């Protein structure tokens, strides 16, 4: 929706003050066991029933920091501004996704050789949408765009190692490598949280594994400060 990190935090704070979402200044993506016990009741309050057992991939006491992940409180929202309604619906949608069944896919990667060259072909078959069905498969469509080299099929072929196949047709196309995409505020926030991820040296990357730039409460402000000092600037949805 194009919200800046600073605006997102401000809206989240407003939702918290209205008591319809939990504490916003958290870096955790997990909830504790005691909060998990309240999830079925929270789902009923927001009008959603999921089949049991609920998905537990977001439940981990060890990964909960001072505050757990942002979730709805179950209070009925009223008199929300447009931006507040957008962010609230995002929180609710992600909450439902988190406890929905896993998405199941079958993937295949095949390497062919003509004796000189080696070619790679990748394909995927969706078995069940699972949590992706919450937004009617929008995530599945996003996944397709992320891996343009992967062919989406309704069924995968049965192939055996060493099998000889006949060449039916061949085309030569030219491609160019692409640079890494520009940062968005979302990817920049992630990079700040995981500051050592791009470090190539193993020892340095491991040393920085638990380090980050700023905290969930200060990262948005750090970005705004850099913009005010003309070190970086916004260009549509990108940061340059």
Regions inferred by a protein language model and the residue ranges of each:
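Core catalytic DNA strand-manipulation module of type IA topoisomerases
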Residues: 1-240
